[in-house]
UniProtKB/Swiss-Prot annotation:
Enzyme Commission number(s) of this protein: 2.7.7.6
Pfam family, one: RNA_pol_Rpb2_7
Transmembrane intervals: none
Organism: Methylorubrum extorquens (strain PA1)
GO biological process: DNA-templated transcription
CC annotations in GO: DNA-directed RNA polymerase complex
Descriptive protein name: DNA-directed RNA polymerase subunit beta
Subunit structure: The RNAP catalytic core consists of 2 alpha, 1 beta, 1 beta' and 1 omega subunit. When a sigma factor is associated with the core the holoenzyme is formed, which can initiate transcription.
InterPro entries tied to this protein: DNA-dir_RNA_pol_bsu_ext_1_sf, DNA-dir_RNA_pol_bsu_external_1, DNA-dir_RNA_pol_su2, DNA-dir_RNAP_su2_dom, DNA-dir_RNAP_su2_hyb_sf, RNA_pol_bsu_bac, RNA_pol_bsu_CS, RNA_pol_bsu_protrusion
């Protein structure tokens, strides 16, 4: 360990007992490797392999026109440099992509009209632009329209053949109906299935079913061939009145004789009636030399004839293949003198007559009828002809354009059916179909097993590259049609490839995929862990996958093959449970898309260091021991019997039979679960919540790595890209808050710059509005090794993931404030900003060109006081650093409005004052309700050709200065390095020429050289030719580097000064970023790492919190009743170990203070060596040791890896070492009375997270606001600034109270009585508090609805009704 490192690193005490052999793969490798393989940006020697983008082009090209007079061929593709880099794309809201150029060759043929022979007439090659291809950033994400997105990998059913049954659900008898399904990568599905009558049917693409024999006829077999393919035959020979049948012991094994079996030759009984033919009997019969048995006519009846019996002379068919032998048929065959009868070997026990029965019910008997049937099923209503039917059948399964099994499908099919076709054979063959039907019939006969579709050998992963490949292929196929049409319609001799191609469909397919595919998701950027997890997610949903509604229980369940491949813990709660999974820590995806996990090889009971990655299919045949199996020093397995897994079963075997062993105990779980210490002591449901809630932890203002970690923290911080790792070794040259400059000391390649500049992100907004800010960890002059962490990011500390804070917890009730998982906090937590986070909100405003004239961004806004404009500059845009509150103006904007007719008063005012301000209205951007914060950034975008305002110019100047500084620093280091090398070459030489004033043949020394300006050193000429060429090469390279630097600077400046690409109609756009500081408050959700979540109920003054004897107050009080029923005991063990860590920290702190006081290192070294293992402190100098001690003053960090961590005894040892009680319980005193509580309380440090569910984002109040158009009721929800719903049950409550007037105003003036609510408002303004409720608008809606149904409903008041009744008096004689 380098001494320099200690200053920016904490040494963790490691509890793991099991040595890990395999290196954990990079956590975002899944994404990067897949996309790199798809793009293959750099063309290797000898051209690109046929995969990824290359294979897409190869599969679509060449394209020929309809007359085959021209051919458009694909030659190669190249990518140009992207127009903007990642940061520029983020800022400008554009897609990070590189232009794709494809070289195409157009060949035009001359066709001889008589012979039809072709000769090449003309060949033209051209590079064609095919749209932009999005590039992946270094962190495995894509920038689409300025936002970071992730393409989630999809789990789908592997192509190949699957055998299954309906579990007895289809038929009432509960009979198992077997089915086989051939699933291609693309093309028609083929199902072969049994029905309840044991007839075998076939379906194509889930359409109507046909007898399987029709498919076999279509493949070119006839009835006899079908039977001979599926059945063996037995020849019966006439022997007097009886028949002779060959004796075959294998065939008759297990056969129970109903009558005596008699040897046909000797006539003796070889097996008596009622006995079973077992292996011993069979052997004895064989030894006697029995070749034939005697069979009576009765034995033949019910058997089936194996081939057509034909009278050779007349051609008359006596019996057809497959006919059942009846007494009548047997007699007629005897009559014509048939002496040998070939019979199908069907015994109805081991071999069933299914195919023969199917053949019997099939009305087709020849190829033509079968093809017609298939055609009618696939294209109902079209009249078939033999040609169309043949072409259609061929295109279904045998045409590589339409049908593709893929390499995976072929490999799976070969494995399942014991075939040996090469994996380049991507279409179906006749043999494949026959093998499938055979295997299915064998299943029905009880041979073989059905497949488990949830086995990970039958599910594969489609990552970014493959998803993108399929999408791009679709785009190219759309394009192909257009190209063909265009080739036929233009004069082919004069056009170039460019004129034939319209790349829009291809570009649109890519855009559609990244913009709106279900698998292209807005990246979860809450914290570094959520980013990593999102990139490692596996979804069974999405196009070509399952849907939530259809997915059953089995698909969602944990399967034995998930071990080490998919995490059994981390999955969402709710409707997606089990459909969205996470890749396990050591898992990787192989070239076929199957998930592999590593194992160590075990040879003769000795564990080797050889690591093998195996997929679920390969693993099935081995005995696999667990990572914690007992071993001695020589790595020999010590147990008499070792617990192993094999093919999903757990068994015990002798050590010498073990083949493999797990590489690590944590290979079973995902990254998030591997971050939970004492995971093994938590219930699975709570572990699931713990994994999921860590992803919602908000980055805090001060990150604090956990006292009790698992050792995974550094890995996540590094691989997520949150913390910055050094790209090359070197020396730190400059450091400030926004960038680090490192001089690469080991760079030998002269073409690469000798300097690395790392830009740190400062207060950038993440996708979830959390704050991304990085801070340097290195000092000037420090040496840095490649891969070392040089800057911390959000939620990282000293290069370790730090999602929350270590707080002092007491497990005890406190006045009911921690009832039902509520959390009681101390005021110290708020005062010291322990759980304070910064959130950055983004607001944007656009100035458009409207019909009435352009909108304008300005400070000059009508009817706004100077006070309201105090934060705006002269351009009308808010200053950086201004503190703003709800309702404040951020950007002043005015919009022209149409001339409205003026009232006389207005005309008078106009005449007097000449006021012209009335024709614009104020449409400024204001701070929305509930937001208060500080402006941290403002960005101004202008359209091309629109003059930039003051503010835009200032921002541009600042940016150019920054770029110039970067260029100057690189130039300085380049100069320093080059001239140092030049001086080394020149010193000691005697040049024959030099700068002005140099006397030749003087031997150069450093003093002489330094008299001349550095730029003149190149003028020295030495005699040695070799050295002279070296100097010239050095100068050339120096000039080139200088030129490159300047060019890069000018390009960036040009991009800055160029206008921005804005949406149509937008002249100018301003984005304002407001940083909001959120302290913790009641209503915020917090959680530990063990699924122990709760809501803050109260924040108590520090003096009222329970305290220890030494006066230390608890920070947080949790309810002890939250532990037993939830069974997440890990939190208690974590608390104990955290308590020990803090105690040890106090001891180390005293020793460090003693060292600083009297410079005696011995006590500190003794203290540190007692805590850490010798390897952890190896090679530390005294200063480094003191620095390491200083870093652990607050607590000695521990690492307890999952399933391999601290045991109870280890925790007790640590507690004793820290001088604490072994029970980790302490006497606590009540903060309010000062009296001790009557029993000891568990107290210690627990790692708590503040989750993204903040009360500030949810709380909301409205007085007046927007109303729904139709019902006129207030809208709902915070986003719409809506009201509170007063629903049916609330109405019942008021009815129950008898609060009639309150109820009336709730349902009228406070809701949708339009006239009434206006009157109430006016009354309140007048200071009057009486009002009258009118008719709610929803009543009018109801009346309109009824009228639309043809019911004439009218609303009349009771007074009008009375008047109407009075008018209609009954006539006097009505009573008579």
């Amino acid at each position: 360990m380098a001494n320099t490192l200690v200053g920016r690193k904490r040494i963790r005490k490691f509890f793991g007992k099991i040595r890990e052999v395999a290196e954990m793969p990079n956590l975002i490798e899944v994404q990067k490797a897949s996309y790199d393989q798809f793009l293959m940006v750099d063309e290797p020697e000898g051209g690109r392999a046929d995969e990824g983008l290359q294979s897409v082009f190869k599969s679509v090209f060449p394209i020929s026109d309809f007359a085959s007079t021209a051919l458009l061929e694909f030659v190669r593709y190249t990518f140009e440099q992207p127009k903007y880099d990642v940061d520029e794309c983020r800022q400008r809201g554009i897609t990070f992509a590189a232009p794709l150029k494809v070289t195409l060759r157009l060949i035009v043929f001359d066709v001889d009209p008589d012979t039809g022979a072709k000769s090449v007439k003309d060949i033209k090659e051209q590079d064609v632009y095919m749209g932009d291809m999005p590039l992946m950033t270094d962190n495995g994400t894509f920038i689409v329209n300025g936002t970071e997105r992730v393409i989630v990998s999809q789990m789908h059913r592997s192509p190949g053949v699957f055998f299954d049954h309906d579990k007895g659900k289809t038929h009432s008898s509960g009979k198992l109906l077997f089915a086989a399904r051939i699933i291609p990568y693309r093309g028609s599905w083929l199902d072969v299935e049994f029905d309840a009558k044991d007839i075998v049917h076939v379906r194509i693409d889930r359409k109507r079913k046909l007898p399987v024999t029709s498919l076999l006829f279509a493949l070119g077999l006839d009835g006899e061939e079908i039977l001979s393919t599926f059945y063996n035959r037995v020849a019966y020979q006439r022997d007097g009145a009886d028949w002779r049948v060959p004796f075959d012991a294998e065939r008759l094994k297990g056969f129970k004789a109903s009558v005596d079996l008699i040897d046909a030759d000797s006539g003796e009984v070889v097996l008596e009636a009622g006995k079973k033919l077992n292996a011993r009997n069979a052997r004895l019969i064989g030894e006697k030399g029995t070749k034939f048995l005697r069979a009576a006519d009765e034995d033949l009846i019910g058997q089936y004839i194996a081939e057509d019996l034909v009278n050779m002379k007349t051609g008359e068919i006596w019996a057809e293949a497959g006919d059942e032998i009846s007494e009548k048929l047997l007699k007629s065959l005897d009559d014509v003198g048939v002496t040998e009868l070939p019979v199908l070997d069907i015994d109805h026990v081991n071999v069933g007559p299914y195919i023969r029965n199917t053949l019997a019910v099939d009305k087709n008997s020849a190829r033509e009828g079968a093809l017609f049937d298939i055609y009618r099923v696939m294209r109902p209503g079209e009249p078939p002809t033999l040609d169309t039917a043949e072409a259609m059948f061929h295109s279904l399964f045998f045409d590589s354009e339409r049908y593709d099994l893929s390499a995976v499908g072929r490999v799976k099919m070969n494995m399942r059916l014991d075939l040996d076709a090469a994996d380049t054979v991507r279409t179906l063959r006749r043999e494949d179909m026959l093998a499938v039907v055979k295997a299915l019939v064998d299943l029905r006969d009880g041979k073989g097993e059905i497949d488990d579709i949830d086995h990970l050998g039958n599910r594969r992963v489609r990552s970014v590259g493959e998803l993108m490949e399929n999408q791009y292929r679709l785009g190219l196929l759309r394009m192909e049609r257009a190209i063909k049409e265009r080739m036929s319609s233009v004069d082919i001799d004069t056009v170039m490839p460019q004129d034939l191609i319209n790349a829009k469909p291809a570009a649109a397919a890519v855009r559609e995929f990244f913009g709106s595919s279900q698998l292209s998701q807005f990246m979860d950027q809450t914290n570094p862990l959520s980013e990593v997890t999102h990139k490692r997610r596996l979804s069974a949903l999405g196009p070509g996958g399952l849907t939530r509604e259809r997915a059953g229980f089995e698909v969602r369940d944990v399967h034995p093959t998930h071990y080490g491949r998919i995490c059994p813990i981390e999955t969402p709660e709710g409707p997606n449970i089990g459909l969205i999974n996470s890749l396990a820590t050591f898992a990787r995806v192989n070239k076929y898309g199957f998930i592999e996990t590593p194992f160590r090889r075990v040879k003769d009971g000795v564990v080797t260091d050889e690591v093998a990655y195996l997929s679920a299919m390969e693993e099935a045949k081995y005995y696999v021991a667990q990572a914690n199996a007992g071993m001695d020093e020589g790595r020999k397995l010590t147990d008499d019997l070792v617990v192993c897994r094999r093919a999903g079963e757990v068994i015990v075997v002798a050590p010498d039979r073990v083949d493999l062993m797990d590489v690590s105990p944590k290979q079973l779980v995902s990254v998030a679960a591997a971050l939970i210490p004492f995971l093994e002591n938590d219930d699975a449901n709570r572990a699931l919540m713990g994994s999921n809630m860590q992803r919602q932890a908000v980055p805090l203002v001060r990150a604090d790595a956990p006292f009790v970690g698992t050792g995974m923290e550094a890995v996540v911080a590094r691989d997520s890209g949150a913390a910055i790792a050094a790209r090359r070794s070197g020396i730190v040259d400059q450091v400030d808050a926004t960038r680090i400059v490192i001089r690469a000391s080991e760079e030998t390649d002269p073409t690469k710059p000798g300097v690395d500049i790392y830009r740190l992100q400062k207060f950038q907004r993440s996708n979830q509005s959390t704050c991304i800010t990085q801070k340097p960890l290195v000092r000037v002059g420090e040496p840095v090794k490649k891969g070392e962490i040089i800057a911390d990011g959000p939620s990282t500390e000293f290069g370790e993931l730090a999602l929350g804070r270590n707080v002092l917890v007491a497990f005890m009730p406190w006045n009911g404030y921690n009832f039902e998982d509520s959390i009681l906090l101390s005021e110290r937590i708020v005062k010291d900003d322990v759980f304070t986070s910064i959130h950055i909100e983004e607001f944007e405003v656009m100035a458009r060109d409207t019909k009435l004239g352009p909108e304008e961004i300005t400070r000059d806004i009508p009817n706004v006081s100077e006070e309201a404009l105090k934060n705006l500059d002269e351009a009308g845009i808010v200053y950086i650093g201004a503190e703003v509150h709800a309702g404040d103006i951020l950007v002043g904007k005015i919009t022209p409005k149409g001339e409205s007719p003026m009232t006389p008063e207005e005309k008078l005012l106009r005449a007097i004052f000449g006021e012209k301000a009335s024709d614009v209205r104020d449409t400024s951007l204001r701070v929305p309700p509930g937001v208060t914060g500080t402006i941290v950034e403002v960005r101004v975008f202008n359209r091309h050709g629109v003059d930039k305002d003051e503010r835009a110019q200032a921002i541009e100047r600042e940016e150019i200065e920054r770029l110039a500084k970067d260029r100057d620093d690189e130039q300085t280091i380049l100069d320093r390095n080059t001239y140092a090398r030049l001086a080394e070459v020149l010193i000691g030489q005697s040049p024959i020429a030099g700068p002005k004033g140099f006397r030749k043949d003087t031997t150069l020394t450093r003093e002489i050289i330094s008299e001349y300006p550095r730029s003149q050193w190149w003028q020295f000429a030495v005699v040695d030719d070799r050295m002279m060429t070296e100097i010239e090469a050095m100068q050339k390279q120096y000039d080139e580097s200088k030129k490159r630097l300047e060019q890069r600077f000018l390009d960036k400046v040009e991009k800055l000064q160029r206008g921005d690409e804005l949406p149509p109609g937008v002249m100018k756009m301003v984005k304002v970023f407001v940083a909001v500081k959120r302290k913790i408050q009641p209503g915020d959700k917090m959680a530990g790492r063990h699924g122990n979540k709760g809501v803050v109920s109260r924040i108590v003054p520090i003096e009222d919190m329970p305290f220890l004897e030494d006066g230390t107050h608890a920070d947080i009080v949790l309810n002890p009743l939250g532990v037993p029923s939830r069974m997440n005991v890990g939190q208690i063990l974590e608390t104990h170990l955290g308590w020990a860590a803090a105690g040890l920290g106090r001891k180390v702190s005293k020793a460090v203070d003693a060292y600083l006081k009297n410079q005696d290192i011995a006590p500190l070294r003794a203290e540190m060596e007692a805590i850490y293992s010798p390897s952890e402190l190896e090679g530390l100098s005294d200063e480094a040791l003191a620095e390491a001690g200083n870093n652990v003053r607050r607590g000695v960090p521990m690492a307890t890896p999952v399933f391999n961590g601290a045991k109870e005894a280890d925790i007790e040892t640590m507690l004793e070492m820290a001088g604490l009680d072994r029970s980790a319980q302490s006497t606590l005193y009540d903060g309010r009375t000062g009296e001790p509580f009557d029993r000891k309380v568990t107290m210690g440090y627990i790692y708590m997270l503040k989750l993204h569910h903040l009360v500030d984002d949810k709380i909301h109040a409205r007085s007046i606001g927007p109303y729904s158009l139709v019902t006129q009721q207030p809208l709902g929800g915070k986003a719409q600034f809506g009201g509170q719903r007063f629903g049916e049950m609330e109405v019942w409550a008021l009815e129950a109270y008898g609060a009639a007037y309150t109820l009336q105003e709730m349902l009228t003036v406070k809701s949708d009585d339009v006239a009434g609510r206006t009157k109430v408002y006016e009354a309140i303004v007048r200071g009057d508090d009486t009002f009258e409720a009118g008719i709610p608008e929803s009543f009018n809606v109801l009346v309109k609805e009824m009228r639309s149904l043809g019911l004439n409903v009218e609303l009349t008041s009771s007074k009008q009704q009375q008047a109407a009744n009075d008018q209609i008096e009954p006539p006097a004689d009505a009573a008579e």
